Amino acid sequence: MPLSRRDLFACLAACTTLLAAVPAAQAQDKPKVVLTVSGKISKTNAPGKFEFTMDMLAALPQHSFTTMTPWYKEPRKFTGPLLRDVLAAAGVQGKLIKAVALNDYKAELPVDDGTKFPVVLARLMDDKPMPVRDKGPLFIVYPYDSDEVLRSERYYNRSAWQLKSLEIE
């Protein structure tokens, strides 16, 4: 028995829905990029940039410190790779970092901060992943309690949270 127009359209709609779901399912299998480094870099893993997944950041040597911050009432423990290790992985060659947050807030910091201080690209706070609503998933944190110089607006303003990219100039 031949298909009616109605049955034919229903079949086409079902096939279209199934075909549309295939790329979405494949995209779920690909690890999510949480940080992009671009600009003056010598290493890339995507056209013109170096993309990090959370697993890639976790595979770098991890460092922790506990410090007071202006954003929390109690000292917090921050854990993640050193900023200098992230920059080295991307072959950073510039002198200035423009850290860009998910809401497009931008903070500028010298690349040298990563060598002068053990700045952490925190992915954990108090040993737990940081949700976006609490400054995650990534947060540039200086060890404020380790040096009086770091307890100033200059360094607090360089501490971008909800970090999504580093643009190197």
Question: For each of these PLM feature ranges, what is it?
Answer:
Residues 17-24:
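C-terminal segment of classical bacterial N-terminal signal peptides
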Residues 5-9:
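N-terminal export leaders
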Residues 10-11, 24:
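Intrinsically disordered, low-complexity segments enriched in polar/charged small residues
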Residues 2-3, 26-169:
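N-terminal intrinsically disordered, low-complexity segments enriched in P/E/S/T
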